[in-house]
Amino acid sequence: MFLAQEIIRKKRNGLALSSEEIQFFVQGITTNSVSEGQIAALGMAVYFNDMNMDERIALTTAMRDSGTVLNWQSLGLNGPVIDKHSTGGVGDVISLMLGPMAAACGGYVPMISGRGLGHTGGTLDKFDAIQGYQTEPSSELFRKVVKEVGVAIIGQTGDLVPADKRFYSIRDNTATVESISLITASILSKKLACNLDALAMDVKVGSGAFMPTYEASEELARSIAAVANGAGTKTTALLTDMNQVLASCAGNAVEVKEAIDFLTGAYRNPRLYEVTMGLCAEMLLLGGLASNEADARAKLNRVLDNGRAAELFGKMVSGLGGPVDFVENYSKYLPQSQIIRPVFADMQGYAYSMDTRELGLAVVTLGGGRRKPGDTLDYSVGLTQVCALGDKVDSSTPIAVIHAQSEAAFAEAELAVKKAIHIGETAPEKTPEIYAYIRASDL
């Protein structure tokens, strides 16, 4: 038997907590036997004194075990259970292609995703743009679609990781969100509750990233890779670029359209293709579905080219309540905004840099994102045909196309887009889409 205040005192004094102490405290978060004040105090103690790797693993696994841990054995799946998670960005539509692509290569992808908050878009919000799609299906339907289709992308259910929900809301209100240890446990407890065989982690870097610097992003990536592998899930973290919009669009319905165009081959943005392939290939390697990266990429290109990945996306949508002909006739089902109009550059030159966070906030201003949890979204609005860094532009070249519901909203977004995309006299140096892979062997 432990006392919550003694656990707080120990961490306040910079000492390491035992796994038993951490389990006791997390159980108290779940059962409400630990007060909000005590949770806030421990969060602040961890923020200032940090946790070693053993503590991080203990916190992550205790939070994972605070609720239901999914069990796939009873389904008799004939392939590995694999997934990816992103720290969030702008125009990050990867999950919509990656899930069906990995499933088409023999994996099973039970992806539990979140909604957008702040400048980053949420995967669930994109699916909410699809008429009829159930982002909160019953456990039975979720398992049925995973088994029969190979992929199901849904929202977090109430019985998964209840400790994280309470801990996170208190961290958000007490300025301890930025702790690497607590971020690691929050992200991984949700993913590990899905009982994965392997995980690819996408940690964003740059002006649209969650972490403020490359160094902070790398520290988070290393922490996640070390803790996940330490907890028994094969994991690789990728550091990927978010100094510009990842797809050529940002929003909800507009990103669904780009995902379908990617899967069918109608249009594949080169940067989006590179990051999607990098993450998906890593999932196949970790899951034992490919012998090396070249083999993984060949398999992924095959399921794109033969239409199998697009077919599975369609089956997932219809299996979760959406239209059966969604892939073939998506324009019939996706909402469209009243005003669709380009924004032009004020001067001749090159797209030199981008404040990606501000572009994400422009989508929020249009109504496509949340200022606070619970806000209602307009799924039709957003940006399309966003220029890429290095593109040559002039006063007749659109740097983006705005999808808005009113002239006032368009005007506000136009100002934001012009301010966020900086035009220079020369083209910037090209940066890689993927900066680094952090594998278990690198830790």
Curated annotation (Swiss-Prot):
Question: Could you state one GO biological process linked to this protein?
Answer: thymidine metabolic process
> What EC number(s) is this enzyme filed under?
2.4.2.4
Catalytic reaction equation(s): thymidine + phosphate = 2-deoxy-alpha-D-ribose 1-phosphate + thymine
Superkingdom assignment: Bacteria
Q: Which pathway or pathways does this protein act in? A: Pyrimidine metabolism; dTMP biosynthesis via salvage pathway; dTMP from thymine: step 1/2
The entry lists its GO molecular-function terms as: 1,4-alpha-oligoglucan phosphorylase activity; thymidine phosphorylase activity
Annotated keywords: Glycosyltransferase, Transferase
User: Which Pfam families does the record associate with it?
Assistant: Glycos_trans_3N, Glycos_transf_3, PYNP_C
A single cellular component GO annotation: cytosol
Described function: The enzymes which catalyze the reversible phosphorolysis of pyrimidine nucleosides are involved in the degradation of these compounds and in their utilization as carbon and energy sources, or in the rescue of pyrimidine bases for nucleotide synthesis.
Assembly, in brief, is:
Homodimer.
Similarity comment: family membership? Belongs to the thymidine/pyrimidine-nucleoside phosphorylase family.
Q: What is this protein called?
A: Thymidine phosphorylase
Q: Highest lineage ranks of the organism?
A: Bacteria, Pseudomonadati, Pseudomonadota, Gammaproteobacteria, Alteromonadales
Q: Which gene encodes it?
A: deoA
